[in-house]
Each structure stands twice: as structure tokens, then as C-alpha cells.
Amino acid sequence: MTIALGQFTKDENDLFDTMDDWLRRDRFVFVGWSGLLLFPCAYFAVGGWFTGTTFVTSWYTHGLASSYLEGCNFLTAAVSTPANSLAHSLLLLWGPEAQGDFTRWCQLGGLWTFVALHGAFGLIGFMLRQFELARSVQLRPYNAIAFSGPIAVFVSVFLIYPLGQSGWFFAPSFGVAAIFRFILFFQGFHNWTLNPFHMMGVAGVLGAALLCAIHGATVENTLFEDGDGANTFRAFNPTQSEETYSMVTANRFWSQIFGVAFSNKRWLHFFMLFVPVTGLWMSALGVVGLALNLRAYDFVSQEIRAAEDPEFETFYTKNILLNEGIRAWMAAQDQPHENLIFPEEVLPRGNAL
């Protein structure tokens, strides 16, 4: 019996190895395999948004002017969602709706699906980029895990919510004022601010801002070696060979302030990761629930009593009336295809009126 000792050798011109060597080469801007997804999708998403906000009207889908060409500014320009009649069509340029006509494709709202889908894959590509780089330099993948929070929010709001409704029409358009309109829509039709998942999202984002402010201030406060530079920011010298702040001093300070404090840096920084990411995940779950038209808190007993007793009113019943007003005033403008008309006498008014 013959035993061959040695290493299996591949063909020197193996295509995969050649691509891997080029993609993962050490350069100023890392490309990587994730870059094959990230860079094209990000380019098309951003380019599509600039094209839409600069040149494309929303007259045929929303009855609105939405581009710089029509007189909008940065706050009012948008890439608008397709009309409700197009339902969940991908609106491909070569599809049955546009039939290869670029102008018609833009008029139908094809740029919105183009930007939304390329944007989603671009964000996923950016997360994969963080995974790939972390693996290359032997880091843990927590940066990528943290970035899954914004991805979850984007996908739930721009893709899953309209998929649960009758069409892409009910997703947010890509613009500043358009997002504000969508927030009003969410409040009026879903009572979103009283949803516990929204509450967790707000607690996560604002809690993270508080944690960042406290953490940054504490580190600056406990510096014990500022370096020997003459300028005001000598503490920011990046060439110091070791840490120059005191965790022990910080622990003692916050123990006196709150009675409790983080005892080690790992738990502290994990908590700073956990709070915002969990908040974003929870808010994304809440939006998925809204896609299915699930209701959160409906205090029916208060509504019944308010209907029976003109003098009984709570902040909850006042908010319900506000939501009815939002629905009534938005529906006629926001859903022109329904030809909704609300006479003055049916618009909601508070008990005091």
C-alpha cells in the first residue's frame, strides 16, 4: 500500500482564488465579497433618489409636485410610492406596466420600488461588510449585529408594512415631509404612539442617547493623564500607549450618585449595545404587527363612557378624537382614488364643542 504525503494543490489560475485575492486585498477602501452587493445597490439607491427628487413628478400617483424641477425644496421633494391601483407590483422597467418606457416607468412610481429594494439590499450588504471585515481581523461580529437594528426598521417600515396593506402606496415616500406625513398616517390609523412596541423603541433610542452622553462625559471627567501638548484638546492625543482614564474613579462617582454603577467595561459597553438595538428590534416588530392591522391598547370602557357622558373626557379619549380627525382630513387628500368626501358635520369634535 502506498501513502502519499503532501498538500493538495489547486490550479494556480483558479478563478475563485483570483477574485478572493483581489476583492480582499488591503487597500484604502476595502471591497470584499460583500462589496459586490453593497456598492452597486448603494449606488443605484442613492442615484435613484437623487434622480427622482430632481426630475420626477408624483402627479400621476399622488396628485403632488415632488421634485426640484417643479419648485420643491430639500424638505418637500420626494420619491413617491406608486399608485394604490398598482398594488404590490415590482414595477420592473421591462414589466407589463412600463413596457420598457423609462418616462412612463418614472410616472408610475417605478423609482420608489427601485430605491426601496436596492436600499434594502445595500443596507444588508453593509452589514455583511462588517461581518467580513470583523472575520478578517479576528473581531467579534457585534458591529454587524448592532446594524441589524436599523435594517430591521427599514425593512419593516418600507417593505413589510405595505406588503400587509393593499399596496406599496401605503409605504412612506422617500422624502423629509413625506416621512412626516407617514408618521401622521401611522398615528391616525394605528394609534402608534400608544403601541407598547413604539414605547420600547423610543425608550431604546432616547436611552441610548442618554447612555452615550453619560459615558462620554464620564470618560472625559476621569482622565488622569492629558499628555504634554499645549493645546486645549491634548487629551485627545491618539499616540498614548495606554488608557489614561480611571474606571475605578468612574465607578466610585456613579456609585455615590445612583447607589449602583457598572463594575467592568464589558458589561457597560454591552448595555450600551443592548439598549438601542433592542429598542429598534422591538419597534420593527411593532410595525410588523401594524402591517397585519393588529391593535395595541384600545381602552374601550373609556370610549363608551365618553360617548354616554358628555362631561367625561380623558387624555386617551381626546387622542382618539384627534386620530379620527387625522383619518378624516388625511383620507380625502391621501387616497384620491377613493373619491372620499367628508361633510363638515361628520368631522370629529371634542366633547367641549
From Swiss-Prot:
InterPro entries: D1/D2 (IPR055266), Photo_II_D1/D2_sf (IPR036854), Photo_RC_L/M (IPR000484), Photo_RC_L/M_CS (IPR055265), PSII_PsbD/D2 (IPR005868)
Modified sites of kind N-acetylthreonine: 2
GO biological process: photosynthetic electron transport in photosystem II
UniProt-annotated location(s): Plastid, Chloroplast thylakoid membrane
Enzyme Commission designation: 1.10.3.9
Record carries keyword Chloroplast: yes
Binding site for pheophytin a: 130, 143
Binding positions for chlorophyll a ChlzD2 per the UniProt entry: 118
Cofactor detail note: The D1/D2 heterodimer binds P680, chlorophylls that are the primary electron donor of PSII, and subsequent electron acceptors. It shares a non-heme iron and each subunit binds pheophytin, quinone, additional chlorophylls, carotenoids and lipids. There is also a Cl(-1) ion associated with D1 and D2, which is required for oxygen evolution. The PSII complex binds additional chlorophylls, carotenoids and specific lipids.
Top-level taxonomic group: Eukaryota
Residues modified as Phosphothreonine: 2
Protein family membership: Belongs to the reaction center PufL/M/PsbA/D family.
Record's miscellaneous remark: 2 of the reaction center chlorophylls (ChlD1 and ChlD2) are entirely coordinated by water.
Record-given protein name: Photosystem II D2 protein
Gene giving rise to this polypeptide: psbD
